[in-house]
Amino acid sequence: MKTIKKNKKLPLTQAALRRKAINAGVKFIAEQTVFISEDTKFGKNVLIEPYVVIASKVSVGNNVTIKSFSHLEGSKIGNNVVIGPYARLRPGTKINNDVKIGNFV
């Protein structure tokens, strides 16, 4: 019989990660279609539309909208930003404040 070590930290499920984000003030249009990484950092007044993937090492500023079918990875997003729809932000991407980003970035 296998047991789990007491001190081993188990990764949070997607439902738990989304609930944590909601409790921090993030708004989802269809939360069950969004996947976020455990290390994602969210500012205030963030709206995430359906079918978004936020992979590891992403920080999202205040007043940000992430539109449908966008994929973010290793990116830093400033304040007052609109991303997507269909945007792909690759590792190392830095989006300044007051920017609108379309697809294929």
Where on the chain are the PLM-derived regions?
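Structured N-terminal alpha/beta-domain signature
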Residues: 1-6, 49, 67, 84
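Terminal amphipathic alpha-helical/low-complexity segments used for targeting or macromolecular assembly
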Residues: 1-33, 37-45, 80, 98, ...
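Extracellular beta-strand solenoid repeats
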Residues: 27-29, 35, 41, 47, ...
